[in-house]
């Protein structure tokens, strides 16, 4: 019987002891956005629920202030 072994994902923000996610930190936010501009879910990234909420809020603020694009491909 073959079992799928999945590596445990760790929350980067918990390990680095980051309390608040800043919307002006574009380099950090780009790691959690797909090529199309969607926010990557926590089941893929491994972030905890608290930080995922902060992350989505920060991405939405950065989009509103034109620091991040809503989508990459405009046609």
Swiss-Prot record:
Alphabetical keyword list: Ribonucleoprotein, Ribosomal protein, RNA-binding, rRNA-binding
GO cellular component, one term: cytosolic small ribosomal subunit
Spans traversing the lipid bilayer: none
SUPFAM superfamilies with a match to the protein in the record: Ribosomal protein S18
One Pfam family matching this protein: Ribosomal_S18
GO molecular function annotations of the record: small ribosomal subunit rRNA binding; structural constituent of ribosome
GO biological process: translation
PROSITE patterns from the UniProt entry: RIBOSOMAL_S18 (PS00057)
Protein role: Binds as a heterodimer with protein bS6 to the central domain of the 16S rRNA, where it helps stabilize the platform of the 30S subunit.
Family assignment from sequence similarity: Belongs to the bacterial ribosomal protein bS18 family.
HAMAP family in the cross-refs: Ribosomal_bS18 (MF_00270)
UniProt subunit comment: Part of the 30S ribosomal subunit. Forms a tight heterodimer with protein bS6.
Record's protein name: Small ribosomal subunit protein bS18
């Amino acid at each position: 019987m073959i079992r799928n072994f999945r590596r445990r994902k760790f929350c980067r923000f918990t390990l680095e002891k980051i309390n608040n996610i800043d919307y002006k930190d574009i380099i950090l936010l780009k790691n959690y956005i797909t090529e199309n501009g969607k926010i990557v879910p926590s089941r893929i990234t491994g972030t905890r629920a608290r930080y995922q909420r902060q992350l989505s809020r920060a991405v939405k603020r950065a989009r509103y202030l034109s620091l991040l694009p809503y989508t990459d491909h405009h046609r």
